[in-house]
């Protein structure tokens, strides 16, 4: 079976590494998605274990589609009756990039019509009831080549099940996990987020430290598939739980807003990591730690979303002064979409990496503690 894992731009290498660790074969990455080969048992394994992928798609076919007739015939050739029961719903969604068939609604209609014709012929009926559960069909048209998939995940994998409410502009859990992994945190050193918001980054750090699979507390679309035995899901969950660590961890989140801290504590409890994460009301401008080593990973408020630009820059300036008090053994990673972040922070990044939080373009700025101040030229 061929799988495709869509992901936020910039996370492809992390997703590819996750797939290799899960022993998937023929892993290959391209912009915004990673492909691999596996068996039916890998559907639950991927959904339960992936931290940075957006969802798990089973590729059913790939074929040239320069026109509607080619698209129709390619979709109609797929043995839909082997996977979609007679009365199940099969909605269609997709996208088109650099293709002659650029109208997504028109392509959706063609894919739906072709799949319905094939199913109608197989089940001997002109009209399909679509009263049962859902098989979500997806397609991607890229440079006149169509790929057709079934979505095994349902809700995106960033929905871990622990964040019932958000405050302000949320950071996707998949991106939060990616930031933690990019910081090279593995659970041994102190970990801090002085702008914790709803607690997503510290919670994802705790899940990584404990090696707890992020999908254990939610359900997936493919759990209802008749073609996928329930035992595969039970085996995948048991395998994941057997690999959990149980230790003591120094993970801390702070926020100046008491309601954010309370929400973070609630979310940590839902995630099952409240025993290893502390949340406190704290001012990021006064952040300080004496330990020789540690990771600081944070996503301060973006000027264009939560604060006026001038307020945001003042916040970055005071936070930058605090970060410079950290010992040289600390690694600092800050995610921001602010184009003048480095100037306001008072230091040029040692390394930068382009990332996206949904459709919002950001940069991950990498530093070490103890660096000298650079003059603010603004």
List each language-model region with its residue ranges.
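Non-catalytic nucleic-acid substrate-recognition regions in nucleic-acid-modifying enzymes
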Residues: 1-133, 377-378
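Flexible, glycine-/basic-rich loop-and-beta segments that form/coincide
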Residues: 45-52, 155-160, 164-165, 371-378
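A short, flexible beta-alpha/helix-coil linker loop
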Residues: 97-100, 156, 301-305
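C-terminal edge-of-domain segments
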Residues: 137-150, 365, 374
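SAM-dependent Rossmann-like transferase core, predominantly class I methyltransferases
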Residues: 148-184
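Conserved S-adenosyl-L-methionine
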Residues: 171-288, 305, 310-313
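C-terminal catalytic and target-recognition region of SAM-dependent MTase-like enzymes
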Residues: 283-286, 290-378
């Amino acid at each position: 079976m061929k799988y495709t894992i869509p992901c936020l731009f910039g996370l492809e290498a992390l997703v590819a590494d996750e797939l290799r660790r899960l022993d998937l074969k023929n892993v290959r990455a391209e912009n915004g998605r990673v492909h691999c080969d596996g068996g039916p048992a890998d559907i639950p394994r991927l959904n339960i274990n992936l931290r940075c992928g957006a969802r798990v798609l089973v590729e059913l076919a790939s074929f040239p589609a320069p026109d509607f007739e080619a698209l129709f015939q390619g979709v109609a050739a797929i043995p839909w009756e082997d996977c979609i029961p007679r009365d199940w719903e099969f909605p269609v969604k997709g996208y088109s990039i650099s293709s002659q068939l650029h109208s997504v609604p028109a392509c959706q209609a063609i894919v739906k019509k072709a799949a319905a014709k094939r199913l109608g012929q197989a089940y001997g009926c002109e009209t399909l009831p679509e009263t049962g559960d859902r098989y979500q069909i997806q397609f991607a048209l890229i440079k006149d080549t169509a790929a057709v998939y079934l979505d095994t995940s349902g809700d995106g994998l960033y929905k871990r099940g622990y964040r019932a409410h958000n405050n302000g502009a949320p950071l996707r859990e998949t991106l939060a996990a990616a930031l933690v992994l990019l910081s090279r945190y593995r659970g041994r050193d102190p970990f801090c987020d002085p702008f914790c918001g709803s607690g997503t980054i510290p919670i994802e750090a705790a899940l990584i430290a404990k090696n707890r699979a992020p999908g254990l507390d939610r359900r997936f679309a493919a759990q209802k598939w008749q073609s996928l035995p329930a035992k595969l899901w039970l085996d995948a969950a048991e395998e994941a739980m057997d690999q959990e660590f149980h230790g003591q961890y120094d993970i801390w989140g702070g926020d100046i807003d008491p309601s954010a801290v309370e929400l973070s504590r609630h979310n940590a409890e839902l995630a099952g990591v409240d025993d290893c994460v502390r949340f406190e009301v704290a001012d990021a401008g006064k952040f300080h730690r004496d330990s020789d080593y540690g990771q600081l990973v944070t996503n301060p408020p973006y000027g264009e979303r939560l604060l006026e630009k001038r307020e945001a820059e003042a916040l970055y300036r005071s936070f930058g002064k605090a970060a410079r008090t950290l010992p040289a053994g600390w690694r600092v990673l800050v995610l921001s979409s602010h184009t003048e972040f480095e100037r306001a922070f008072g230091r040029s990044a040692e390394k930068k990496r382009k990332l996206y939080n949904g459709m919002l373009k950001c940069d991950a700025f990498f530093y070490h503690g103890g660096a000298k101040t650079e003059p603010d030229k603004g």
